[in-house]
Amino acid sequence: RMTLTKIAMTKRGRVALYADGAFVMSLHPDVFAASGISVGSQIDEDALRELSDAAELREARERALSMLSRQDYTARGLRDRLTRHVSEEAAGQAVERMQELGLIDDERYAARFAQELLERRHYGAARIRQELRRRGIDSQTAAAAASLEENDPQAHILAVLEKKYPQAAGD
């Protein structure tokens, strides 16, 4: 057990904890406030681990929100990106929370991405399925999105030909 001897704000707006005169860790102010600890509090390794886990989960959630504000991700894609900075467990919990909030929806992502691949790149259903699977969409969802998008194969073929041979489009 250690005794917290000092609590100070860092230049970056975090709360630095010192136990027995030595720096222990820094926390987000909200995580610190929720912990209920103060100078003179007795703290053990388990309590430090809990604080560290809570801080990491907060960081994972903040990173997830920041990433999702810039672009859409699949659940797997977001989890993969988050694990570069936080533990698998924290990344998984953050992804679950984003799904609960409706910020990640693999079916919605698949439908939108399939539409884009069809219209912009003129991909066929098989290639759309392949691209969706590569991004972490399950095979059933990928197949459903690809089949929705290729409802007129003849129009798709004409669009590809017009793009490849624009001079012949008038004939």
Give names to the regions the model predicted.
Residues 1-171:
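An alpha-helical, amphipathic repeat domain used for nucleic-acid recognition
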